[in-house]
């Protein structure tokens, strides 16, 4: 599958790879570079681009396309209590609250790491790795009560992540929401 904005990404020099069933940018060619892999056991052709992107994100802000990440929803009167049983962190049942957490296996080992977002009371979106979509879906269903539906909405939504020390400055220019820690 390609992303909805594939052609736009390509026009900006994206070099694509596959992850989680999606063709997605792995890196962006710098001016004058070819947006293609030159495979080698030595210095990789994409190292300068990756270094530039990393440094820019560390010092400023970077926009990352996370559309292939797995996305699930549960909505039920018992949704919050069910998530409290299967997640290691305290899940907030308040709209807009977002919690990074883990799910464990019976031996106490980490099965997956994920983010749980409360959309409205007892209605949650769960976001996890693109590469572990089916495994995570199986694991979550295994521990949810059978009367709670887990919907896979991965292919229905685009997701972007804004990272870096200047990310809040940028998001304030496009949203009236409060993104401060509180």
Residue ranges and their predicted role:
Residues 1-182:
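Glycine/proline-enriched, intrinsically flexible loops and inter-domain linkers
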